[in-house]
Swiss-Prot record:
Disruption phenotype: Reduced pollen fertility. Pollen grain exhibit a partial formation of coat and impaired water absorption and germination capacities. Glycans are attached at residue 24. This is GDSL esterase/lipase EXL6. GO terms for biological process: lipid catabolic process. GO terms for molecular function: lipase activity. Flower buds and pollen. Required for the formation of pollen coats and male fertility. InterPro entries: GDSL, GDSL_lipolytic_enzyme, Lipase_GDSL_AS, SGNH_hydro_sf, SGNH_plant_lipase-like. The gene is EXL6. It is found in: Secreted, Extracellular space, Extracellular matrix, Pollen coat. One of its GO terms (cellular component) is extracellular region. Coiled coil: none annotated. SUPFAM superfamilies: SGNH hydrolase. Its EC number is 3.1.1.-.
């Protein structure tokens, strides 16, 4: 059933994007916040073990060069930005990097691989927390003002930009780890995650953000790393972890619906991005989309130290990240959803 939904929405997205003007007129820029699903290289400049700037990452990227993206090529940030007719690549925003004026005006990425909406997750992995990313966005605004020179123009760019957010994947992954169990139930924790997400969105709103595309959590129980640790020789998904994920996603979706009518978020628009359902459809029906492997990773696992020859045939490139091809497939209905919901 979901497969048909992806197919129909893909046709709609092709029509919408092809019938639009050659240059995007709906969105001024795209800003990405969150974790490794969106990180385009910010962790390169951090003292953390979570990096994607070495072989075999980037094998399908331009010049086959690792950039810090956690995958074989472009990541979800890049693919959504291109689908929305903004630009093909979204650079990582690091305060020690020089970014062109054009990139400053059309969007950058603040996401950090390993980040969580729970500060403890980010501190444990020594990556940028949600609060750190907000601080970086404030710093970015100063640079944008120097480039644009007009406050009104800065406000227009930010208010008409898509704020793409992916948080929660690492929080839920580490919540079930015995060493990091909190003294609370999973339902209590997922409710707290929604509260933290609201604060994060409000911080961005107060800085001018108005168009939010907020991603749910992936089916983390079906990631290769959890299949290997939970599923044994059969490679089963961790159904418990998926249930916790579904609980959070349901609460997040309800929260976004309520935020849209709150005075605190006046004039803001929210789209819930169902990456759980779209990615799960690929996991359950890989051959329908041209994939031959949905359980194992192409690389970076004990049973796949050397990368596979055809990453486009794998749903997952490494232990926890979809391949570029998988991102391209699931992005089609999502781009249509964002374009329609935030226009």
């Amino acid at each position: 059933m979901f497969r048909g939904k992806i197919f129909v929405l893909s046709l709609f997205s092709i029509y919408v994007l092809s019938s639009a003007a050659e240059k995007n007129t709906s969105f001024s820029a795209l800003f990405a916040f969150g974790d490794s699903v969106l990180d385009t290289g910010n962790n390169n400049f951090l003292l953390t073990l979570l990096k994607g700037n070495y072989w075999p990452y980037g094998l399908s990227f331009d010049y086959k060069f690792p950039t810090g993206r956690f995958g074989n090529g472009r990541v979800f940030t890049d693919i959504v930005a291109e689908g929305l007719q903004i630009k093909r690549l979204v650079p990582a925003y690091s305060k020690i990097r020089r970014i062109s004026s054009e990139d400053l005006k059309t969007g950058v990425c603040f996401a950090s691989g390993g980040s969580g909406i729970d500060d403890l997750t980010s501190r444990t992995l020594r990556v940028l927390s949600a609060g750190d990313q907000v601080k970086d966005f404030k710093d970015y605004l100063k640079k944008l003002r120097r480039v644009v020179k007009r406050k009104k123009k800065v406000k227009e760019i930010v208010s008409n930009a898509v704020f793409l957010i992916s948080e929660g994947n690492n929080d839920l992954g580490y919540f079930v780890a015995p060493a990091l169990l909190r003294l609370q139930s999973t339902t209590t924790y997922t409710s707290k995650m929604v509260v933290w997400t609201r604060k994060f969105l409000k911080d961005l709103y107060d800085l001018g953000a108005r168009k939010f595309a907020v991603m749910g959590v992936m089916p983390v129980g079906c990631l290769p790393i959890h299949r290997a640790s939970f599923g044994g020789v059969f490679g089963w998904c961790n159904f418990l972890l998926n249930r916790i994920t579904e609980d959070f996603n349901m609460k997040l979706q309800k929260g976004l619906t309520s935020y849209a009518v709150e005075y605190d978020f006046k004039d803001a628009k929210f789209v819930y991005v169902d990456i759980y359902g779209t990615l799960m459809d690929l996991v359950k029906n890989p051959m329908a989309y041209g994939f031959t492997e949905a359980k194992k990773a192409c690389c970076c696992m004990p049973n796949a130290i050397i990368p596979c020859f055809h990453p486009d045939k794998y749903v997952f490139y490494d232990f926890a990240h979809p391949s570029q091809k998988a991102y391209e497939v699931i992005s089609k209905p999502i781009v249509y959803q964002i374009a329609k919901g935030l226009a």
